[in-house]
Each structure stands twice: as C-alpha cells, then as structure tokens.
Regions:
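C-terminal, charged low-complexity interaction regions
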Residues: 130-223
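Domain-level detector of nuclease and nuclease-like folds
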Residues: 82-172
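DNA major-groove recognition helix of helix-turn-helix/homeodomain DNA-binding modules
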Residues: 77
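Phosphate-binding glycine-rich loops and adjacent basic patches that engage nucleotide phosphates
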Residues: 31-39, 123-128
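Histidine-centered nuclease catalytic patch
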Residues: 19, 40-73, 81-101
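Catalytic cores of transferase enzymes with a strong primary signal for eukaryotic protein kinases
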Residues: 2, 36-38, 46, 71, ...
Length: 223
C-alpha cells in the first residue's frame, strides 16, 4: 500500500439529489488522487476500474456515497476484498501504510512462490493485521481459474519493475568503472523515484532497499 492525500472537497456528483459514486467526476478525481493505482496492490493503469468502499456500505447510503470511503481499485482486489474484510488501513490518513506492512515479491512466478506480506516497522494494530490478511489474499490467492490468471499477471508486472531495481542495484554496487558523484547520484535518484507514491508497487521497492544492507547504506532511508 501507499499513502496519498485526499482533498477535503468532494466531487459534485456526491452532493446532488441523484448521487452517483461512479460518475466521471468521482472516478477522475480518485484516479488523480491514487495516481491511477489500485490502493491495495499498487498496480497502475489497469483498464477495468472499480470504485471500492473501504468500509463495506451494505446498503447504507451514508457509507455508499461518503467521499472518504471511496477508493480506486482493480477488479482482482475489489472482488477479493468484497464485503468480508473490514477495519482496513486508510491510506489517506496520517499513518505511513508502506511502513506498516512489509512486502517482498518472489523471483519465480508460480503458485508455490508467495509474496511475503508481514508486519513492518510500526506497532501492530487491528487495522494493520486486518490489512495484512487482505493483502496476502490480494497478492497470493489462486482459488479460482480466473484468480490464477490474474495473480500470474500481477506477479509478472511486479517482477518487471523488480528487474529494473536489480539492474540499478547492480550498476550502483558493481560498476564497470568507478562512479563519479553525478552518475552515482543519478542511480540513487532512480531508486528513490521507484519509492515515490506515484510509482507502481512502490512499497515493494522501499522494503527491497531497506532490507538490503549494501543498498540501504548508499541510498539511505526511503520511508
């Protein structure tokens, strides 16, 4: 997960007599706020967008059209979360959700190699534990044929950027010739860009750098 800032003013479609949380102004505003990324898995630029209710509305019109309860999500994460997962971290609040939950992607893409989802640097809480359980399902669940396909595609996307990080790491730690300050600074900046909230799967790269003794010494704190 990644932290974002939600503006207090909400789209007009949520204040009219015929409220619509799927109206274009709502969807476009959420797309901008969340950098076109799923608020759970951090996939970016997916074609099938769902407007997710972090707190399931269960027919409650107040929750259904509450601006602060609407989140940008992919089909996979939205269907897995459903109405059963509650007490989920709100990435629009002050808590650094990327620090709360540690994530690591496997190097091999099959059902037997799981994404590691565990408690990060913050003290545990009901919300953190609930979100860990949900994210573990989002990244690893393959209980239907469609979820096997969507999970494989998701991991492939993560691994694409993971390869970029490993390439930068190699060039930074094992250069062909000694690095001067400018190219070294450029490589470090490339890694920091990957840790920005607008970058796909940014929480993975924060933890990859943080847990790498050599890389973290060069790059510094990325949280």
């Amino acid at each position: 997960m990644f932290s974002v800032i939600r503006p207090p003013t909400f789209p007009k479609s949520l204040s009219t007599s015929t409220k619509d949380y799927r109206a274009s102004d709502v969807v476009e505003e959420l797309q901008d706020i969340f950098f076109a990324k799923c608020y759970l898995c951090e996939r970016q630029g997916f074609p099938d967008v769902n407007i997710e209710h972090r707190d399931p509305h269960l027919g409650d019109s107040t929750k259904k059209f509450d601006w602060h309860n609407l989140f940008y999500a992919c089909v996979r994460c939205n269907s897995i979360k459903g109405d059963t997962h509650i007490n989920i971290l709100d990435c629009c609040q002050s808590i650094d959700v990327s620090q709360a939950i540690e994530l690591h992607c496997p190097a091999i893409n099959n059902e037997n190699h799981k994404v590691i989802v565990k408690l990060g640097n913050l003290p545990t809480s009901l919300e953190i534990e609930s979100t860990i359980q949900l994210l573990d399902r989002c990244f690893n669940e393959t209980n239907t044929s469609l979820r096997k396909i969507s999970r494989h595609s998701l991991i492939r996307d993560i691994q694409k950027y993971q390869k970029q990080l490993l390439n930068i790491r190699f060039n930074l730690l094992y250069p062909k010739r000694p690095l001067t300050q400018i190219p070294k600074h450029e490589l470090v900046n490339e890694l920091k860009v990957m840790c920005s909230p607008d970058f796909p799967f940014s929480a993975f790269w924060k933890w990859a750098i943080t847990r790498d003794a050599d890389l973290s010494r060069v790059v510094g704190n990325v949280f």
